[in-house]
Amino acid sequence: MTRRYKTMDGNAAAAHVSYAFTEVAAIYPITPSSPMADFVDQWSAKGQKNIFGSTVKVQEMQAESGAAGAVHGSLNAGALTTTYTASQGLLLMIPNMYKIAGELLPGVFHVTARALASHTLSIFGDHSDIMACRQTGFAMLGEGNVQEVMDLAPVAHLAAIKGRVPFLNFFDGFRTSHEIQKVAVWDYEDLKDMCDMDAVKAFRERALNPSHPTMRGSHENGDIFFQNREASNKYYDAIPEIVEEYMGKVNEKLGTDYKLFNYYGAPDADRVIVAMGSICDVAEEVIDYLTAQGEKVGLVKVRLFRPWRADRKSVV
């Protein structure tokens, strides 16, 4: 498949992909994620169409907590909804993340992973914000450079739609979000070709509608609550295979080799780094240098962090 090349940063790559699959974007700015929402807002104002032939409706809220609440409500109304955030902004979204995941709604949060403020503020990249979301029920998919953001961000949206599990798609703040690279860009027709339109239709049919009312958000005692929580396990068990399926479709179109875990380095390595994010590109350069000197070292790149499938690690 032939793709055109453009020079852009990680935020622009994520915005380009997310716009294709988004009907409503609930936004609130926070460094270093703000450009993603800015791009989406600009494209919406210009009337740019997504893969469904409509213009994204953008709503800026009063805070990140409001943006997450708007995502939750919009998803319940049957609109594929996205937001963009980082750091303390992501923490403010956690209460709604539990609800979105618990109700099996296919929202996607694009996160420029950033340090959490502690003794002082830091706007630079680390994974302390996304690590605070491990237990929310969101699937978590990560990329290590701008081209990977372009290539794999569709997997988050596509797997969320088919698997009925929300996704947190993350890449490192500034190190990837603001790094400018020449990247091969998705054409929206190719993204549309990979989208399961039957799953989109089923999602819209589950929306709140007075023509077929349902009761949601009620109270349950411990016995029933526990059973209903366990009932969602089958959706999480299916996510790794669904992600692999869409990675396979991406690989087929692009000639890439994306997997849940990718290995790089000596086949008989006696020392291996397990990592995710922008450190992987640096590690690959170090591995090239060390293996050239006869050292047996390698890298396992983690792409799907949640749900974690340890058995898949043996594949690498």
Positions of predicted regions on the chain:
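Thiamine diphosphate
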Residues: 1-132, 137, 154, 173-174
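Glycine-/acidic-rich phosphate or pyrophosphate-binding loops and their flanking alpha/beta elements
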Residues: 7-13, 248-271, 284, 288
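Short, solvent-exposed amphipathic alpha-helical segments in soluble enzyme
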Residues: 41-44, 98-101, 157-159, 184-187, ...
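A general structural motif
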Residues: 121-123, 242-258, 275-283, 302-310
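Conserved thiamine diphosphate
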Residues: 123-173, 197
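Redox- and metal-dependent alpha/beta enzyme cores, enriched for Fe-S-associated oxidoreductases
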Residues: 263-295, 308-312
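Conserved small/polar residues in nucleotide/adenosyl-binding loops
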Residues: 315
